[in-house]
């Protein structure tokens, strides 16, 4: 046998076994390593489970650790599922032996010190009723500053069971009791001048359910206003108010108010760490009580904040929130709510009267009208003028009157300036019963820096961006919402739904959308941060606006609309989200407003050089669902009233205004007019004064108002003036190039080709005789409106009620009309047979 063969035989006989054994040992070693790692992971999981169980023991299941106290059935508000309950409690235990000082001193010195300083982050771990480790005794502790003596009494019979002993300075009282069975108790506090029987808030179960916490943490709780804030309710069989506040970075939070002497030590709140919300149910506190939240920041600062979800507040300049009961208002506007989707569609006539409630009309002593008084006066006034909608400047509570409501602090509270919330509901209902829709100006773009508001709410930049290049609006000195934080976006979307659901508003006009869309809005180079792609588009705001519109259209009552105040050329603002748009129903046409007002300011002798300012808007009129807005922004800040913008003497200024309003109503787009413009107020709007109603004694002003009423009725009655506002087939120029005579003419066309009106506008004070325009059909063209009619304060020139066509080709049409054009006037003619 060769050497090679011998080695092979040896390996076959002996050598492989040791190698296999080594392999097996290596595998066994690796398996043991894996097992060791698994055991370490299991140990860590057990540690985490232990910590979670401790949190749950402290914060979620106090009933299990407080003398095994059984609670009545609690309905999980978010899910509607009743939680299981234990049997009814046994009769209360009567304590025979007196309490001793040793029994009372059952609190760690550190816990006592933090309670007395109002700095305890887990009051439920100390206050209330707690089982001792032996499970044979319980300890009851309560913090009642000012109480000379505190007794434990039977909840059913009010019998005194024991007297608690004061601890330390005497503001904390405590006692140890034997606990052979369940104990249901109340506290009887003896003060210097009164005795009060109290239910212990620290013996109550949590207010928020697990589903609430889950949805709040994800920013998907569309009913957040029904869980956060202050809610009078029956909880654990007790009447009181549940308080809940999102302040994840605060070290401790208390609710303070008129019910506890504004003492932050009395009602310290429990933190739900899974969502960053602090909560406490306070028995015996009811509607009307004033309150705020006292927060201690991680830096040790103390803050006193109004409730972001408060549904009522004190009237400014006071800043406390007020507990408000759930409304039991019995709405009677079902018919309107069913039909409003059609009344607010893109094909419907929409003519909006914009109102600032504080300055529309006032009492002789200067007081503003209340909601009910406005309903008595404003609704019939607007309805008589033929408007379809009222739009209210922001009414969410705001501290600074000079902001007109555009710097709100309490977004869920109708301003107390004009009454209580149900009075606002009555106003909206009466508008609906009168056939008027109600739109609300809504401000999600920014908020003021008032100390009691949202700024640095829990000591951190909770609602706003931390970087001032994103979080500060320099033009308004306000803070910008951090829309990329889902809790903040949820706060705003829940607020939008709140107004639409709870007050039956028919839509929201969303303020300052352009400032939301652009990161460099009103910022110089170096003062803004680009997005992740290096651009200036605010991607978080785009996502928020799309989500807002989708939510409103899905979850608000049917037919609610959204309108964007967007002043740039951002595309597809009113296109559906599914098509790549922002999802608004309508967009203010700021370009039309700026161009046409600049034209009207020009002296008529020079207008022929600027005719493009009137016609340019028709190049993009079909790109969006537009609202032609002549709003409050155009009559303030030294801009003058609409009438003051018009050139010429008094007669010419009124004639120009009448012409401009007629031009607006005959132009494609929905209509909006700010209060006072309907009668040609001469003075610039002042938010501290009512409108100049005395001007209606002037025939010229009365004539302007009469014209506005007739324009509204004509606009609503003639389908060709509104059905195809965003359809190029609904408009056709007759002549847009007669700059020499400064005259333009067009047709508005309805669903049928023969349903149209002819509009002719003369923008000079020179009457035009024999002015010929082409028309498509032969027949008599009845004059529907003449802004120069004597009834409106004009000269009375016109066409004697109408004109018959002549077979003279003009402007590419086989027929034409020979017209007398009054000075500074608009004429509207109906098609033959219409």
Swiss-Prot record:
Catalytic activity field? Transfers a segment of a (1->4)-alpha-D-glucan chain to a primary hydroxy group in a similar glucan chain
Q: Does the keyword section mention Glycosyltransferase?
A: yes
Judged by the first EC level, this protein's enzyme class is transferase
InterPro entries attached to this UniProt entry: A-amylase/branching_C, Branching_enzy, GlgB, GlgB_N, GlgB_N_E_set_prok, Glyco_hydro_13_cat_dom, Glyco_hydro_13_N, Glyco_hydro_b
A Gene Ontology biological process annotation?
A: glycogen biosynthetic process
Molecular function per GO: 1,4-alpha-glucan branching enzyme activity; cation binding; hydrolase activity, hydrolyzing O-glycosyl compounds
The active site annotation covers: 511, 565
Q: Write the record's keywords in alphabetical order, separated by commas.
A: Carbohydrate metabolism, Glycogen biosynthesis, Glycogen metabolism, Glycosyltransferase, Transferase
Extract one GO cellular component term from the record.
cytosol
EC number(s) reported in the record: 2.4.1.18
Its pathway?
Glycan biosynthesis; glycogen biosynthesis
The keyword Glycosyltransferase is assigned to this record: yes
Q: Which residues form a coiled coil?
A: none
Stored NCBIfam families:
branching_enzym, PRK05402.1, PRK12313.1
**Record family assignment:** Belongs to the glycosyl hydrolase 13 family. GlgB subfamily.
| Subunit relationships | Monomer.
Q: What does this protein do?
A: Catalyzes the formation of the alpha-1,6-glucosidic linkages in glycogen by scission of a 1,4-alpha-linked oligosaccharide from growing alpha-1,4-glucan chains and the subsequent attachment of the oligosaccharide to the alpha-1,6 position.
Q: What is this protein called?
A: 1,4-alpha-glucan branching enzyme GlgB
């Amino acid at each position: 046998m060769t050497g090679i063969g011998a080695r092979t035989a040896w390996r076959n006989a002996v050598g492989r076994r040791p190698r296999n054994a080594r392999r097996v040992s290596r595998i066994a070693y690796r398996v043991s390593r894996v097992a060791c790692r698994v055991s370490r992971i299991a140990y860590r999981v057990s540690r985490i489970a232990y910590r979670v169980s401790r949190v749950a023991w402290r914060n979620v299941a106090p009933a299990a650790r407080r003398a095994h106290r059984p609670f009545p059935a609690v309905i999980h508000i978010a899910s509607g599922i009743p939680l299981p309950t234990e049997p009814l409690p046994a009769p209360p235990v009567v304590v025979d032996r007196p309490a001793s000082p040793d029994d009372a001193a059952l609190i760690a010195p550190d816990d006592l010190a933090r309670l007395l300083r109002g700095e305890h982050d887990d009051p439920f771990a100390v206050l209330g009723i707690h089982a001792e480790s032996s499970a044979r005794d319980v300890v009851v502790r309560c913090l009642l500053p000012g109480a000379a003596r505190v007794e434990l009494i039977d909840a059913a019979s009010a019998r005194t069971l024991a007297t608690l002993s004061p601890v330390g300075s005497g503001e904390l009282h405590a006692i140890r009791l034997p606990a052979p069975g369940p104990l249901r108790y109340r506290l009887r506090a003896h003060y210097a001048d009164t005795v009060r029987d109290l239910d212990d808030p620290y013996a109550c179960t949590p207010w928020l359910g697990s589903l609430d916490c889950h949805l709040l943490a994800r920013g998907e709780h569309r009913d957040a206003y029904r869980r956060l804030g202050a809610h009078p309710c029956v909880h654990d069989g007790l009447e009181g108010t549940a308080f809940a506040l999102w302040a994840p970075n605060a070290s401790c939070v208390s609710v303070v108010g008129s019910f506890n002497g504004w003492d932050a030590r009395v009602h310290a709140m429990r933190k739900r760490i899974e969502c960053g919300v602090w909560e406490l149910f306070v028995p015996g506190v009811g509607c009307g009580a004033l309150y705020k939240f006292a927060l201690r920041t991680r830096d040790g600062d103390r803050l006193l904040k109004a409730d972001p979800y408060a549904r009522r507040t004190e009237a400014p300049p006071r800043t406390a929130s007020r507990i408000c009961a759930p409304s039991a208002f019995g709405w009677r506007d079902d018919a309107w709510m069913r039909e409003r989707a059609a009344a607010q569609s893109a094909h419907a006539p929409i003519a909006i009267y914009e109102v600032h409630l504080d300055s529309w009309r006032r009492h002789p002593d200067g007081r503003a009208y209340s909601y009910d008084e406005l309903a008595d006066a404003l609704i019939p006034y607007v309805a008589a003028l033929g408007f379809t909608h009222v739009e209210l400047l922001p009414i969410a509570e705001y501290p600074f009157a000079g902001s007109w409501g555009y710097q709100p602090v309490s977004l869920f509270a109708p301003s107390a300036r004009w009454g209580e919330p149900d009075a606002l509901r009555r106003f909206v209902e009466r508008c609906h019963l009168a056939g008027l829709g109600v739109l609300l100006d809504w401000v999600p773009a920014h908020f003021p820096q008032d100390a009691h508001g949202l700024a640095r709410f829990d000591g951190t930049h909770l609602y706003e961006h931390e970087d001032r290049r994103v979080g500060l609006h320099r033009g308004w000195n306000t803070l910008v919402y951090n829309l990329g934080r889902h809790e903040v976006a949820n706060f705003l979307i829940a607020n939008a739904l709140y107004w639409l659901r709870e007050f039956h508003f028919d839509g929201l006009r969303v303020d300052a959308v352009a400032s939301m869309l652009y990161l460099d809005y009103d910022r110089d180079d170096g003062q803004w941060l680009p997005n992740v792609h290096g651009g200036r588009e605010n991607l978080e705001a785009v996502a928020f606006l799309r989500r807002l519109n989708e939510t409103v259209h899905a979850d608000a009552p049917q037919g609610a609309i959204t309108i964007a105040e967007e002043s740039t050329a951002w595309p597809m603002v009113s296109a559906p989200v599914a098509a790549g748009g922002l999802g608004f129903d309508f967009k203010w046409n700021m370009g039309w407003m700026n161009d046409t007002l600049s034209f009207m300011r020009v002296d008529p002798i020079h207008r022929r050089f600027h005719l493009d300012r009137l016609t340019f808007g028709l190049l993009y009129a079909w790109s969006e669902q537009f609202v032609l807005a002549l709003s409050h922004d155009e009559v303030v800040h030294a801009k003058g009233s609409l009438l003051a913008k018009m050139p010429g003497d008094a007669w010419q200024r009124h004639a120009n205004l009448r012409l401009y309003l007629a031009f607006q109503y005959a132009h494609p787009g929905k209509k909006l007019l700010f209060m006072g413009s309907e009668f040609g107020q001469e003075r610039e709007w002042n938010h501290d004064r009512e409108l100049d109603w005395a001007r209606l004694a002037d025939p010229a002003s009365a004539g302007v108002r009469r014209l506005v009423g007739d324009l509204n009725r004509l606009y609503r009655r003639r389908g060709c003036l509104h059905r195809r506002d965003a359809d190029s087939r609904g408009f056709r120029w007759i002549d847009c190039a007669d700059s020499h005579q400064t005259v333009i003419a067009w047709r508005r066309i309805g669903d049928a080709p023969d349903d149209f009106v002819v509009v002719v506008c003369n923008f000079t004070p020179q009457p035009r005789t024999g002015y010929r325009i082409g028309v498509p059909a032969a027949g008599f063209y009845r004059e529907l409106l003449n802004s120069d009619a004597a009834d409106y304060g004009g000269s009375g020139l016109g066409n004697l009620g109408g004109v018959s066509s002549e077979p003279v080709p003009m402007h590419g049409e086989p027929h034409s009309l020979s017209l007398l054009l009054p000075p500074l006037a608009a004429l509207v003619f109906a098609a033959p047979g219409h």
